Amino acid sequence: MRLLVTGGSSFLGAWLCQRAAPNHDVVALHHSTALRLNGVTPMRVDLRRGRDVARLQAVGADAVVHVACKIKAPGPGEASAAEAAAQINRQLMDAVLALELPTVYASSTVVHWSQDTPYARSRREDERRLRESGLPYAILRPSAPYGPRLATHQPRHRESFHTLAALVQRSPVVPVIGDGTYRRQPVHVDDFSDAVLALLQAGLPSRAFEAGGGEALTMNAIIARLAALARRQPRVLHLPKALFVQAARLAPDFDPSLIAAADEDELADPAELEAQTGLVMRPFTDGARDLVR
């Protein structure tokens, strides 16, 4: 199968490409970040340009996996930066739908948040447009994807679990947003990728799936698991969420509204996905070994 993967230079997109490469002809789309993956054909494109979409239509792909997404874009203020990112995401989905191919969309558990953020609205809009397109599709909503570093590629944005694991292994103190009792259901990138490929192989069922890992854990428990594997005992420092929100305003790649909602639970029960694909998502306790070296 010839696959187009948008966001091929992202952590999740690159791992998906690498996982698919042994059995599929994979074309990884990237824009500003150089990409080199074994067995994968890189293709630099700007999906906002019609001529680049025309190039993709000539590739002869069998399906597209849409991973690319913008969280924050340049703008004079927080609201305009979030809206600029949302507009880019609309343009990306415009391009994907124009290909008129079976589509797997890597969405997010943020669609379930009770707090209404521009990013969550953008994800919900993408899902709605894909459902209404008439194309065969599958929507997967991963919770906290994680996995080992790539051997031949460095994504522009450092994967958050790599940052957390490094702190646990090297720092005497690990700062945590709020009380750390909010829950995540981390999914290993190999399991997520295998689920995408299994759905494509069987024929897309035109429905959405939660794509979490095999266990739900509080942030405090996640840190404890990493610390046990690393044989470390760092101090966990719980800090007010407002401090992180203020810091996010100064960082080019962080959306303050997302940090403000960070204490929402992000659970993603994989039972229906497992039943559909025959896979079993590994618990974080097992997969976390890939984060501690």
Which residues fall in each region the model found?
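N-terminal Rossmann NAD(P)H-binding glycine-rich loop of SDR-like oxidoreductase domains
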Residues: 3-22
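N-terminal Rossmann-fold cofactor-binding loop
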Residues: 29-34, 47
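NAD(P)H-binding glycine-rich loop region in Rossmannoid oxidoreductase-like domains
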Residues: 41-99, 109-115
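Conserved catalytic-site region of short-chain dehydrogenase/reductase
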Residues: 73, 109-121, 145-157
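Conserved beta-loop-beta element that borders a ligand/cofactor-binding pocket
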Residues: 128-154
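Glycine-rich "substrate-gating" loop/helix at the edge of Rossmann-like oxidoreductase active sites
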Residues: 146-157, 178-189, 213-215
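Mid/C-terminal beta-alpha module of Rossmann-like enzyme folds, strongest
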Residues: 198-257, 270, 276-293
